Regions:
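Pyridoxal 5′-phosphate
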Residues: 1-374
Length: 374
């Protein structure tokens, strides 16, 4: 099976990540920060090394890097931590459910109001659409850096500037961009949320919540942190405040090797390789008159969203799976984006290569699409 569903989870992983995970299971089994003994200290040191590596990559202070289970958890922590006590929040019409569902839940349970800004092909118009929705009690703008459906890159730097002008918290969903776009907090993010298991090439069960320290978060999870254990109130010390319970040390150590891998390759080189494959794929399948490609001209991360005639995208993905290719059909957990694209009923088939994908594999996939019958 050839994996072209790397936007969901990159696979295969670098060999160094697999080795690091194996070594962690065998040699770093202590509970980090939970005891003064050697095995706890060794695990804590490994976790700190990965935290420091992430801080360096994303331009953060090391104490402002919190580990999470995935990007969805990071987004929930940031959105609910900022909006827990009410107010108004703005999101885009390209959001993943990891943004839209927490916002909807806040509206339903806490009366938080939200607005949805329309994304335009003109970046200045997009920013203007966000600006027009700002109210007196707008506390945050939350948006994806890049759509997980079409790969479209939103004007995140300009939105960061807009937030700074109005003293609004800017929360970025970097799940599809971190690792292929050189994002840092200097791009204007107050919180940058991302997955470890996608383009950072770490194991599943890893994510990052990265902050510039400008906005304090209310907690949505409390518990043991290894700090101020005599107090009933959750510690205010970062990152422990956001890391209740035992950390996933094995996954974190694997993520550390993924970060090393990306830094060594560079996001720019990875982006270039994957985008060349996307362009090759798009050019080949465009020769099939049945194929429709969505947003082919927009600035995007390496993703191609397409459909084959009137065939439902999930059926197409299933047929391709039978031919040995893994692609994602359906709504990609992003109903807002599909409503915007007009694909809510059919969905799309998503092609997303990785640094390990090859031209010959893309050619074989295109040939398989040519032979598919509706």
């Amino acid at each position: 099976m050839i994996n072209f569903d790397n936007s969901a989870t990159s696979f295969p992983k670098p060999a160094s990540v697999a080795r690091a995970v194996s070594e962690a299971v065998s040699h770093f089994g202590g509970n980090p920060g939970r005891g003064g003994h050697k095995i706890s200290g060794e695990a804590a040191q490994k976790v700190f090394e990965v935290r420091s590596r992430a801080a360096e990559m994303f331009g953060a202070q090391v104490e402002n890097v919190a580990f999470t289970l995935n990007c969805t958890y990071a987004l929930n922590m940031a959105i609910k931590g900022i909006m827990q006590f009410g107010g108004h929040v703005i999101i885009s019409d390209y959001e993943h459910n990891a943004v839209s569902r927490p916002v909807y839940a806040l509206w339903k349970m806490r009366g938080v109001r939200f607005s949805v800004a329309r994304v335009s092909d003109d970046d200045d118009e997009t920013v203007g659409n966000f600006r027009a929705l700002i109210e007196k009690d707008t506390r945050a703008i939350v948006c994806t850096v890049a759509s997980n459906v079409t790969g479209r890159i939103l004007p995140y730097k300009k939105l960061g500037e807009l937030c700074k002008q109005h003293n609004i918290c800017f929360i970025g969903d970097g799940a599809q961009a971190c690792g292929v776009v050189g994002l840092t907090l200097a791009d204007g993010f107050d919180f940058l949320c991302t997955a470890g298991h996608k383009a950072l090439y770490g194991p599943t069960g890893t994510g990052l919540l990265i902050s510039n320290g400008a906005f304090a978060l209310s907690t949505i999870i409390e518990g043991g942190t290894g700090a101020t254990s005599a107090e009933l109130e959750q510690t205010g010390t970062m990152p422990e405040r956001l890391e209740s319970g035992t950390l996933g040390t094995v996954g974190i150590i694997g993520l550390g090797e993924g970060l090393k891998f990306v830094r060594r390759k560079t996001p720019e080189a990875i982006f270039g390789h994957e985008m060349r494959l996307c362009e090759q794929f798009a050019q080949m399948i465009a020769q099939d008159k049945r194929v429709k490609i969505y947003e082919p001209q927009v600035r995007r991360v390496p993703v191609v969203a397409f459909n084959i005639g009137d065939m439902h995208s999930e059926k197409a993905a299933q047929m391709l799976s039978q031919k040995g290719f893994a692609l994602r059909g359906g709504l990609q957990c992003a109903a807002l984006a599909h409503r915007t694209l007009g694909t809510l009923q059919q969905g799309v088939v998503r092609f997303s290569p990785s640094v390990f994908s090859e031209k010959a594999q893309v050619n074989a996939l295109a040939r398989a699409i040519y032979t598919m019958k509706e």
